[in-house]
Amino acid sequence: MTIADIKKTTEAKMDQSIAAFKNNLAKIRTGRANPQLLDTIHVEYYGSMVPLSQVANVALLDARTISVQPWEKNMGAKIEKAIRESDLGLNPASMGDLIRVPMPPMSEERRKEMTKLARSEGEGAKVAIRNLRRDANEGVKKLVKDKLASEDDQKRAEADVQKTTDKHIAEIDALVAAKEQEIMAI
């Protein structure tokens, strides 16, 4: 493995960490309705538990309401029950073959909890990025130790990896700040 390979794989892994972090952030509830909020809900479908998105169409009805359209009419009650029993604190209402999921307004205390959760997710993502930086630097040091790269190459590679790390951490900070803004907006 060369220094270029190490830098390339490190950047790719950091990008994957950012993508996973964005996915986790999307699941944190804000005052607005977000169809991704229901991604974690599983419904019993012919004896097995399947994600809600595999048995129904989940869409945004308006800023504070999510609509869930079951593909099979007999699934309505099961979907409604699964949403109600989730830890999201939602109260779905069935309207024929459409299930409306209104988003209750969040209290100030709940908003602060969600902000803390977003920050802790951000810290977790930063730790993952820093661990990738450490792994890359150790890989470069091993190349120098094995006489496959010079110490000058090591310094340049470590500086490049640090720049990549700084870029990704700045992106995480921006995402957390945007999420906090979204949570605190009434």
Swiss-Prot record:
One Pfam family recorded for the sequence: RRF
Molecular function as annotated in GO: ribosomal large subunit binding
Compartment(s): Cytoplasm
Assigned keywords, A-Z: Cytoplasm, Protein biosynthesis
InterPro entries membership: Ribosome_recyc_fac (IPR002661), Ribosome_recyc_fac_dom (IPR023584), RRF_sf (IPR036191)
Highest taxon of the lineage: Bacteria
First-listed, main subcellular location of the protein, grouped into a coarse class: cytoplasm
Biological process annotations from GO: cytoplasmic translational termination
GO cellular component: cytosol
Family: Belongs to the RRF family.
UniProt function note: Responsible for the release of ribosomes from messenger RNA at the termination of protein biosynthesis. May increase the efficiency of translation by recycling ribosomes from one round of translation to another.
Protein name: Ribosome-recycling factor
